[in-house]
Amino acid sequence: MSDLRRKGWWNVPDYFHSPLVFDMEEDKEDYIFGPHDEYLHTLEVHSNTLIQLERWFTPTGQTRVTVVGPLKARLWVMDMIRKVGSKNNLDQIKGKMMLLQIRDHPLRDRDLELHPESGSSLWITTMNDTTFVEVPHFLRFPLTVAWLFCGFVRILGIHNFADLHW
């Protein structure tokens, strides 16, 4: 991850294609990013991502969250947010520990290693070059990804994070 900071990950156009976009409840947003987005800049710097928050984006008052940056970092941020909001106590604890970690120091390469979680699912669909993420509360990873490249749709189905080769 330090190489990304030295070289300037924001100079790599591919990191801005297909951003991760999802909606978040206001109370979870305040918990993760702090009141008045106090921790937002720290989270961005420590995760090598750019995070945009659009408050009251949906009629129910949810915040639209857009994350760009290296894929592993985006997935790490999304996993942390998912775990913080989980109904499962163990996942909540893991998510809160991840949140404290990212507030305290930058992610390391070993933090970005993907570890398979049994019984988990994530659904990602692509529309207008934007990746929308829907994570039903009862599903958590195998991963299905569809990206649109120059008019062609490429679908990548991953049944387990162990199948994902970087």
Swiss-Prot record:
Up-regulation conditions: By NR4A1/NUR77.
One Pfam short name: MOEP19
Single Gene Ontology MF annotation: poly(U) RNA binding
Keywords noted in UniProt: Apoptosis, Cytoplasm, RNA-binding
Family classification: Belongs to the KHDC1 family.
Gene Ontology cellular component list: cytoplasm
InterPro entries given in the database record: KH_dom_type_1_sf, MOEP19_KH-like
Name of this chain's protein: KH homology domain-containing protein 1A
Domain KH: 19-78
GO biological process, one term: apoptotic process
Intracellular or extracellular location(s): Cytoplasm
Entry function: Has pro-apoptotic activity.
Superkingdom of source: Eukaryota
Organism: Mus musculus (Mouse)
Protein's UniProt keywords contain S-adenosyl-L-methionine: no
